[in-house]
């Protein structure tokens, strides 16, 4: 086919969509170029046959940043790209979330999306281009897909309002970094971090983005009109109406009764028994439904039962109404040797969160397409299988753990002190020890508590809450503090974190069409009510950061020296600074402007290192008495060391009031003596006196 190209203006940028020139054997391939600057090649391939063995939709999204895109060669021994970076993993999730709900129910053919950044600058993030390219590639692929999807990034300034698709530089001055994706009718996904914006400002940003990315959707429709392949002739399996009716007739009441059991383990055990009974009764002979078909129908009855109960105003699975937060149990300082710790329990969800303080050298080094940079704040989320009472894989963090950790990080980051106020590296680890819904928001609450327990001067405490939605026709119910089952069976996952003043993070994933502005507004208002409730209970345990750092945390001393003294502190080949660190067990970081940060495992170690630095950088003061050591004796006097690297001369005439024939009659090399600084000439030579010390002391020097 001949190449098809569509251009459109999108905010500050010109976007070009091109297909038919590259990767023509893929089901769909689009090259997205932004301002002749950023180029992302997106390919989509769909398997023609479904994998009968899989009980889920096998969609995979791979976003990859090639170093050649920025004119760089990879570091390391092998000199080629390795495993996905955290940024690549997070962007893959960002692309996956809005497209997944748009594939038809029951579609089980494998679909693989690969987004490759092939050219980039240091001006904008390529993620929006990758999202647009994914939507366009799916639209022309022929794969059943209810798109297209548009996407946009939004910034916010108090003076100028909302800004579409900001540059990195513009984001630095922004109070908001939000990515929104959706169809022409509805918003499907929101990912954001903010600096205490109001709920109205956050909702305004979502609606602003939705309006602005309509131009993207229109351009993709125009591209598809010229370049799309025929849509696959795929039909969903007919609904097993008879099987569903049989299960509901005989087991419907028992299933409904099981969902009144409030303890998760007991409820799961009862539902497991019922499922076994259903399979034993209905999947018994040839010609009857298979066990997998019966289990799928049983799951559908579960789905309908829970949703009907909720929209009809019945109590939720654990007996709560729609607005109640589960009971909280909050503890801080639970681990004796850590720098800060908290145990946050909300119902059957529990997070053990630990904060650790380190030196500037402990900051994470990030090698990105934009260049190397250091990150002084890390938040890591771990979800071991025992947290849900299961055996499972143990190992490195998966995509879900990386995503949840980043959401928790975004939630608390805006409330951390600046490096000029608190120059420590901070690492927070959230260990999920129990889980039944909203473990990422438990991590937010626990992180805030652990940081305050460690003495990190937080600007304000932060709490988070997960909201849910069940919508049947015109009836809907918004749920506060959702359980795991409510997340799975509901239509929306809506997580909001913030302080008492405003929102710091908002994440939203919607599985259905037709989420209105009214629903989002109600959800934000209900989330604020819950957040303030949780913050109130957190503040009863610890309402502000401790006045002092933990005794287990390293001590930091900041000082400044003249820039011409830096080389003296470092020494030849780093010998001086290395010796100080080895002898005092402290670490020293020196900046080009003379700023010095000294970190010691104890106050004594840090102070000892500070005194050594002061000794090296100090200047001899005229009229001050020093205790020095005789380094060398000559015929006309003695050289005495009064400061590290600084010797002065005591002339023979300055040794005593009496006449001195030989210097060695008064002094010996290695002897400690008190000397008075008489003068320092313009060449830095120091003139000392021993005989004038007594008079100087008498005068109060």
UniProtKB/Swiss-Prot annotation:
The KH domain, residue ranges: 554-613
Reactions catalysed, as given in the entry: RNA(n+1) + phosphate = RNA(n) + a ribonucleoside 5'-diphosphate
Residues reported to bind Mg(2+): 487, 493
Primary enzyme class: transferase
Keyword annotations: Cytoplasm, Magnesium, Metal-binding, Nucleotidyltransferase, RNA-binding, Transferase
GO MF annotation terms: 3'-5'-RNA exonuclease activity; magnesium ion binding; polyribonucleotide nucleotidyltransferase activity; RNA binding
Cofactor names: Mg(2+)
Matches recorded under PROSITE patterns: KH_TYPE_1 (PS50084), S1 (PS50126)
Subcellular localization: Cytoplasm
Residue ranges the record marks as coiled coil: none
Matching SMART domains: KH (SM00322), S1 (SM00316)
E.C. numbers: 2.7.7.8
Domain S1 motif: 623-691
Disulfide-bonded cysteines: none
Cellular component, GO annotation: cytosol
Keyword Magnesium assigned: yes
Keyword Cytoplasm: yes
Main location: cytoplasm
A single GO BP: mRNA catabolic process
Function statement: Involved in mRNA degradation. Catalyzes the phosphorolysis of single-stranded polyribonucleotides processively in the 3'- to 5'-direction.
Subunit comment: Component of the RNA degradosome, which is a multiprotein complex involved in RNA processing and mRNA degradation.
NCBIfam families xref list: polynuc_phos (TIGR03591), PRK11824.1 (NF008805)
Entries under HAMAP family matching the protein: PNPase (MF_01595)
Name of the molecule in the record: Polyribonucleotide nucleotidyltransferase
Organism: Pseudomonas savastanoi pv. phaseolicola (strain 1448A / Race 6) (Pseudomonas syringae pv. phaseolicola (strain 1448A / Race 6))
Encoding gene per record: pnp
């Amino acid at each position: 086919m001949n190449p098809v190209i569509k251009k459109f203006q999108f905010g500050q940028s010109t976007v070009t969509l091109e297909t038919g020139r590259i990767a023509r054997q893929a089901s769909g391939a689009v090259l997205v170029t932004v301002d002749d600057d950023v180029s992302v090649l997106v390919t989509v391939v769909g398997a023609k046959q479904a994998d009968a063995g899989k009980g889920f939709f096998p969609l995979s999204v791979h976003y990859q940043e090639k170093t050649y895109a920025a004119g760089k060669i990879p570091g390391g021994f092998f000199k080629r790209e390795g495993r996905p970076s955290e940024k690549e993993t997070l962007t893959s999730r960002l692309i996956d979330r809005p497209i997944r709900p748009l594939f038809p129910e029951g579609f089980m053919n494998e679909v693989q999306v690969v987004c490759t950044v092939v050219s980039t600058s240091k001006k904008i993030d390529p993620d929006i281009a990758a999202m647009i390219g994914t939507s366009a590639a799916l639209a022309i692929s022929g794969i059943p897909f209810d798109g297209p999807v548009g996407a946009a990034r939004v910034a916010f300034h108090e003076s100028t309002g909302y800004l579409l698709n900001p540059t990195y530089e513009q984001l630095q001055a922004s109070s908001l970094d939000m990515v929104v994706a959706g169809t022409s009718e509805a918003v499907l996904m929101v990912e954001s971090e903010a600096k205490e914006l109001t709920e109205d400002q956050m909702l305004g940003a979502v609606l602003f983005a939705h309006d602005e990315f309509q131009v993207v959707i229109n351009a993709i429709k125009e591209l598809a009109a010229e370049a799309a392949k025929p849509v696959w002739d795929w039909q969903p399996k007919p609904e097993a109406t008879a099987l569903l009716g049989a299960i509901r007739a005989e087991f419907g009441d028992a299933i409904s009764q099981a969902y009144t059991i409030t303890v998760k383990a007991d409820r799961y055990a009862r539902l497991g028994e019922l499922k076994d009974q259903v399979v034993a009764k209905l999947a018994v002979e040839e010609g009857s439904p298979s066990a997998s078909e019966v289990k799928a129908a049983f799951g559908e009855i579960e789905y309908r039962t829970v949703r009907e109960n909720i929209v009809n105003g019945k109590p939720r699975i654990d007996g709560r109404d729609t607005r109640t937060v589960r009971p909280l149990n909050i503890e801080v300082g639970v681990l004796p040797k850590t720098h800060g710790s908290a145990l946050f329990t909300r119902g059957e969800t529990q997070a053990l969160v630990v904060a650790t303080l380190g030196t500037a050298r402990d900051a994470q080094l990030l090698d990105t397409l934009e260049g190397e940079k250091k990150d002084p704040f890390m938040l890591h989320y771990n979800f071991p299988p025992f947290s849900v009472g299961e055996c499972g894989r143990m190992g490195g963090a998966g995509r879900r753990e990386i995503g949840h950790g980043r959401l928790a990080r975004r939630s608390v980051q805006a409330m951390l002190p600046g490096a000029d106020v608190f120059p420590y590296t901070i690492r927070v680890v959230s260990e999920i020890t129990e889980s039944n819904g909203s473990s990422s928001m438990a991590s937010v609450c626990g992180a805030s508590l652990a940081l305050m327990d460690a003495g990190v001067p937080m600007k304000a405490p932060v709490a988070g809450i997960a909201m849910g939605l069940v919508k049947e026709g015109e009836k809907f119910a918004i749920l506060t503090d959702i359980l795991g089952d409510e997340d799975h069976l509901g239509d929306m996952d809506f997580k909001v974190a913030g302080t008492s003043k405003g929102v710091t993070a908002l994440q939203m994933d919607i599985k259905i069409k037709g989420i209105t502005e009214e629903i989002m507004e109600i959800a934000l208002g209900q989330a604020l009510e819950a957040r303030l409730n949780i913050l109130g209970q957190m503040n009863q345990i610890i309402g502000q950061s401790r006045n002092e750092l933990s005794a287990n945390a390293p001590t930091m001393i900041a000082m400044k020296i003249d820039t011409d003294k830096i080389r003296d502190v470092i020494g030849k080949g780093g010998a001086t600074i290395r010796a100080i660190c080895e002898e005092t067990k402290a670490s020293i970081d020196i900046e080009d402007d003379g700023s010095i940060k000294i970190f010691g495992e104890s106050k004594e170690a840090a102070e000892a290192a500070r005194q050594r630095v002061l000794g090296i950088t100090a200047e001899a003061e005229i009229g001050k008495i020093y205790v020095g050591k005789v380094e060398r004796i000559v015929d006309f006097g003695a050289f005495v060391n009064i400061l590290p690297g600084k010797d002065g001369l005591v002339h023979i005439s300055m040794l005593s009031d009496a006449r001195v024939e030989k210097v060695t009659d008064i002094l010996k090399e290695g002897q400690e003596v008190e000397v008075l600084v008489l003068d320092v000439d313009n060449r830095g030579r120091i003139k000392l006196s021993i005989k004038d010390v007594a008079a100087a002391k008498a005068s109060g020097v």
